[in-house]
Amino acid sequence: MEKLASLYHHHLATLQTRAQAVLARHKLDALLIHSGELLTVFLDDHDYPFKVNPQFKAWVPVTQVPNCWLWIDGVNPPKLWFYSPVDYWHSVAPVPESFWTAGVEIAVLRNADDIGQLLPAQRERVAYIGYAPQRAQDLGIRADNINPQGVLDYLHYHRAYKTDYELACMREAQKTAVIGHRAAHEAFLSGMSEFDINLAYLTATGHRDIDVPYGNIIALNEHAAVLHYTQLDHQVPSDVRSFLIDAGAEYNGYAADLTRTYSAQSDGAFAQLIKDLNQEMLALIDTMQAGVRYTDYHIQMHQRIAKLLKSHQLVRDISEEAMVEQGLTLPFLPHGLGHPLGLQVHDVAGFMQDDRGTHLAAPTQHPYLRCTRVLEPGMVMTIEPGIYFIESLLAPWREGECSQHFDWQKIDALKPFGGIRIEDNIVIHEGRVENMTRDLNLA
C-alpha cells in the first residue's frame, strides 16, 4: 500500500495540473464532480444497481457510494463530501481511511440534501460533471456549466494517458480477471452450463454480476457468434464443441477486459484456427509501437485474417490483398481490433485527435472500430481479433460473383462452433509494448 500511496500522490498531482489547465481555458473557478445518485425502479421501492460517474472515480477510488461530491480547484487539495447517513435499513460505507485519503480533504455528508449548504456559496463559475443535471440546477449551477462539452473533451482526451497509479491498478485488475478465466476454463472442462461457468468466474474473482465492468459473455457453441451474448443458458448442450469467454474485473475503478476461446477437442479445424489466430494476434502486437495510428493496425489485422482464411481454405482463388480490398474479411471480423481501456471498458476519447475534441471517425468500411488515435506512451488498448461464422453476415455473400471464392461446405461445418475471439490488454510504452495479459501467463 505504501507504493500505491506514492503512485496515487503523483497521480493526484497530474490530475491537479489537468484541472488547472481546463479551468483556465474555460475561465472557471472549480469543478464540482458528482459520484451520482440512485435511480428507483419505476413503480417500485428499490433502486437499480449504482454505477459511479467515471470522472469521479478518476480522482478517488470510491466506486459504490452515491451522493458524494468532489470540489476541484486545481490548487487546494480536492475536497470530498463523503455520503455517510445514519441508516439502519441499508449498509453504510465507512468514511474512508486508506492509502489515498492523506491527499484529499474529507468531510462527512449525513443528509444528501444538505450539500447545497456545505458547498462554497459562489458557484457562478463552477462546472458540474455528473449525470443528475436537475440536482446541479438546484445547486445554482448555470445551465451552460452543466457538463460543458469543452471541459469534458479536455478531461476525456487526457484520460487516454494513464498515470503509473492507473497502470498499477489495471495490472491488479488483470490478476483478478486471469484468476476468473482460469476458473471458468476449469468449469467448462468439467461440463458446466453457461450459467454455472459464470458463477465459477464470479466466485473466483470475488465479484458480483453488478461489480464486473461489463456484462460477462459466457458462450458455448453457436452462442459465440453473438458478439455480446449475455443470456447464460442453464442447460448444457448435448454436444459441447466450443467455449468463448469475454469477461473482466475491476480494481479501484479500473477495468480489465479479457477474452479467450477454447475448443472441446484439441484437434480438428476449429482448434487449429484458434491456434493460428492466436499466433497472428501476437505477431501483430509484436509490431505495435508509439507513433502509429490504431486504424493502421486494424487494417493489418484484416490482412492477417485474409491470410488465415486462405491457409484454412475457407476462401480461395483470390489474393489476400483483394480479399481485404473487396471486403471479404468483413463478415468474419465485423468489429474493430479493440478499444481504449481504463476507467471504462470502452474508454472515452477513442476518436479525439486533440483536447479540443477534434473528431476523426472510423473508416467507412470499418464503422465499428472504436479508436482512430495515434498510439502514444501511456495508452492502454485491447487487442481482440476474431473469426466468426455469423449467418446474417455471411448470407449476402452466398449470392453474387464473390460467392465462388467461399468454401461454403467448410464454412458451414464451422458454424456450430460460433466463432473465435482472443483479447489481450496492452500498454504502449516508449520503445516497447507491455502485454499485461500474457505477462500473467494466460495462454
Curated annotation (Swiss-Prot):
One GO BP: proteolysis
Entry EC no(s): 3.4.13.9
Signal peptide span: none
CDD domains listed in its UniProt record: Prolidase (cd01087)
Gene from which the chain derives: pepQ
Requisite cofactors: Mn(2+)
HAMAP family the UniProt entry points to: X_Pro_dipeptid
Function: Splits dipeptides with a prolyl residue in the C-terminal position.
Protein name: Xaa-Pro dipeptidase
NCBIfam families attached to this UniProt entry: PRK13607.1 (NF010133)
